[in-house]
A protein has these predicted regions:
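Short amphipathic alpha-helical segments
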Residues: 29, 38-49, 84, 93-104
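Short Lys/Arg-rich basic patches
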Residues: 1-20, 33, 56-76
């Protein structure tokens, strides 16, 4: 008999991925996740949605590439991750670069809240 968790309902759309992300930004995202009592994966997804909204055409793509990346196990919505992959390919950047742009947005959004 397979184990069925009663704590968290399994979402079949969410898939595990190994993703290379900036270590320092990931630490900040994890701190924000603890403060907001949520999973850092959900914050990463919020950032990915922002990146999809912001980077629609090549004219507004300014990507800051990180040299401080580490492979991290993440869990994302398969649909959302696929859309980010397609957008990154269309823009000529790495998927991880777009995810990190989303991380910058999440960090910036929460830093503004702290200073208000």
């Amino acid at each position: 008999m397979a184990y069925n968790s009663l704590i968290r309902i399994r979402d079949e759309d969410r898939k595990n991925r190994c993703t290379r992300l900036d270590i320092d930004m990931l630490k900040q995202i994890k701190i924000i996740a603890v403060e907001q009592d949520t999973s850092y994966n959900f914050l990463l997804e919020d950032g990915m949605r922002h990146a999809l909204e912001r980077f629609k055409g090549r004219h507004n793509v300014v990507i800051v590439k990180s040299n401080n990346r580490k492979t991290v196990n993440t869990t994302f919505s398969e649909d959302l991750y696929s859309r980010v992959q397609v957008r990154a390919e269309r823009l000529g950047v790495n998927t991880n670069d777009l995810i990190e742009e989303g991380m910058r947005y999440i960090i910036g959004r929460n830093t503004k809240k702290d200073t208000e």
